[in-house]
From Swiss-Prot:
Keyword field: Disulfide bond, Glycoprotein, Phospholipase A2 inhibitor, Secreted, Signal
Major location (coarse): secreted
Assigned protein family: Belongs to the CNF-like-inhibitor family.
Organism whose genome encodes this protein: Crotalus durissus terrificus (South American rattlesnake)
Organs and tissues of expression: Expressed by the liver.
GO CC, any one term: extracellular region
Cysteines joined through disulfide linkages: 22-46, 25-32, 39-67, 73-94, 95-100, 118-143, 136-165, 169-191
GO molecular function, one term: phospholipase A2 inhibitor activity
Family matches, as Gene3D superfamilies: CD59
Protein name: Phospholipase A2 inhibitor CNF
Keyword Repressor in annotation: no
Glycosylation-annotated residues: 176
Residues annotated as signal peptide: 1-19
SUBUNIT field: Occurs as a mixture of oligomers. Tetrameric arrangement appears to be the predominant quaternary structure. Interacts with phospholipase A2 crotoxin basic subunit CBd; the interaction leads to dissociation of the CA-CB heterodimer and to inhibition of PLA2 activity of the CB subunit.
């Protein structure tokens, strides 16, 4: 059930764009075939996003091709340690043409805990999921907190939130978020220093 919720959450994070023509599709896996669609301002580039949820030896990947705003392209890539040995990772590839090159996913680093932690949470249909302690590893010294919602005709208003450890703060902010014609809203993008674990 956790994987089902996560897959749904990954699809929500990638907003549909609506004056360039780009390929449009979503799928579970590494690639998808779709149809060409006109983009509208501020979505001015074509993009391909690969998303992955990894937990221990298991992983699920999804692919999304769409129109994007240049601000989304600045993210490039992200790796969020959501705790419980689980990661959500993304690779964003933007280009002038419909075909975009992939950025491969490297293997997860075998990093050790670094003495810091962040609130960890992953929620769908809620902005206030129960938090747990996500133990940061390696170079992860920042805490990320993203909250938003997306309106669909069915099932309606879908809320989501994501919290965990990251190595650096993303360039994404509320000021450059894509609102997708009042369908997709980022309500909070917060990044701050991780919390040091208490000494035993």
């Amino acid at each position: 059930m956790k994987y089902l919720h996560t897959i749904c959450l990954l699809f929500i994070f990638v907003a549909r764009g609506n004056s360039r023509s780009c390929d449009f599709c979503h799928n579970i896996g590494k690639d998808c075939d779709g149809y060409e669609e006109e983009c509208s301002s501020p979505e001015d580039v074509c993009g391909k996003v690969l998303l992955e949820i990894s937990s221990a030896s298991l992983s699920v990947r999804t692919v999304h091709k769409n129109c994007f705003s240049s601000s989304i392209c600045k993210l490039g890539q992200f790796d969020v340690n959501i705790g419980h040995h689980s990661y959500i990772r993304g690779r964003i590839n933007c280009c002038e043409k419909e075909l975009c090159e992939d950025q491969p996913f490297p293997g997860l680093p075998l990093s050790k805990p670094n003495g810091y932690y962040c609130p960890g949470a992953i929620g769908l249909f809620t902005k206030d999921s129960t938090e747990y302690e996500a133990i940061c590893k390696g170079t992860e010294t920042k805490c990320i907190n993203i909250v938003g919602h997306r309106y669909e005709q069915f099932p309606g208003d879908i809320s989501y939130n994501l919290k965990g450890c990251v190595s650096s703060c993303p360039l994404l902010s509320l000021s450059n978020a894509t609102f997708e014609q009042n369908r997709n809203y980022l309500e909070k993008v917060e990044c701050k220093d991780a919390i040091r674990l208490a000494s035993l």
